[in-house]
Amino acid sequence: MRSTELVQWFRQSTPYVNMHRGKTFVIMLDGNTIASSNFINIINDISLLHSLGIKLIIVYGARVQINSLLAQNNVTSVYHKNIRVTDPRTLELVKQAVGQLSYDITARLSVRLPHSPVLNVVSSNFILAQPIGVDDGVDYMLSGKIRRIEIDNIKHHLDNNAIVLLGPIAPSVTGETFNLPFEEIATQVAIKLKAEKLIGFSSTQGILDPQGISIPDLLPQDAAKYLNQYIQQGEYHCSQARFLQAAIEVCKAGVKRSHLLSYEEDGSLLQELFTRDGVGTQLSVDNSEDIRIATVQDIPGLIELIHPLEQQGILVKRSREQLEMDIANYTIIDRDGVIIACAALNQYPEENMAEMACVAVHPDYRSSSRGDILLEAIQKRARQLGIEKLFVLTTRTVHWFQERGFRLANVEDLPKEKRDHYNYQRRSKILIQPLNEEE
């Protein structure tokens, strides 16, 4: 990196350094991540986060290491509903694998960065477990679930500048030890602590779309679709599926953002947290976004968003002057100061109709539900204005609108003013949706 690039990166990252300081992050490290050749760099980056004043809880899994140890000892695991049935022999090997990882992670975190203080890593009985019991006639034996989390104790250590380390085994009040899914621990700890972020790692740079391209942003409903795909493909235990399970649950419970990154690419953690767009997949409700009416200050961003679509002939060209005149008609989605989606609501009062026009979503966010969010916002605004029918003219997205309750219509069904200016050369399809609740 050249010196000018380094200076620019520092300047761009400063707001995020200030934003993250004092916040609580829960970091999931599964067995694949720990076994990767890049793990030492991930640990170093975690240490750097701690030095920047971020409160960290590391929750680690050991499935890969456990399976390897079981195979070496000719022990075969039985699964029921995707949960390992842990008998006493299996538990001894689980404890061996987990104990080794706990020591290794602590040792690596204890390696001091130059001119930095020694890290205090705390691993204790913060989790109390209880047996899962019997389900459909199957006894899970020493496979357990969370009974209680000592949240106040965890907070005490975080406030005293310690990193809290949690593994996938926990004691019970009766003195037994149970094997727990590490994603369940990460989920419940993040929720109970009201963490700012949940962070996980996988072999891919986030969740990939069908073309193999990383999806930068997902809403919970979109994430659930990808999770179902992994499950249907028999990949219930893959890193992506286990992260999505946790991320969807914590997101619904109020954790603002979850991030899935590649454990193979050096620096992913820092790039995700200290740049605007990151490198992996972020799951959020929409806390980083603002859905609002556009103002004249938004016109440059609107032009940047819609110009490529105008060039492709997907949208009708609009002059800057026209945008200025109609700016109050536009609803936009603003993500950290960047307009990533827009739609206009043009009224025709005489017929009590309105057009949803100039619908555009930034390419990086088209695999998410931003279109649905815009449609809901436009529908809500139209109803507030007393509009009875909403219509669209489109050359490319007929099916998308039909799936959302619009019906094909004719030119004669348009308001007179729109009908008189209909462009027969574009041959846009006309779709109309009644907005009355009873319809």
Curated annotation (Swiss-Prot):
GO BP, sorted A to Z: L-arginine biosynthetic process
EC number: 2.3.1.1
Pathway in which this enzyme or protein is active: Amino-acid biosynthesis; L-arginine biosynthesis; N(2)-acetyl-L-ornithine from L-glutamate: step 1/4
Keyword Cytoplasm listed: yes
Subcellular compartments: Cytoplasm
Residues in N-acetyltransferase domain copies: 289-429
Gene Ontology cellular component annotations, sorted alphabetically: cytoplasm
Keywords, comma-separated and alphabetical: Acyltransferase, Amino-acid biosynthesis, Arginine biosynthesis, Cytoplasm, Transferase
Entry superkingdom: Bacteria
UniProt record similarity statement: Belongs to the acetyltransferase family. ArgA subfamily.
Additional record remark: In bacteria which possess the bifunctional enzyme ornithine acetyltransferase/N-acetylglutamate synthase (ArgJ), ArgA fulfills an anaplerotic role.
The protein's name in its UniProt record: Amino-acid acetyltransferase
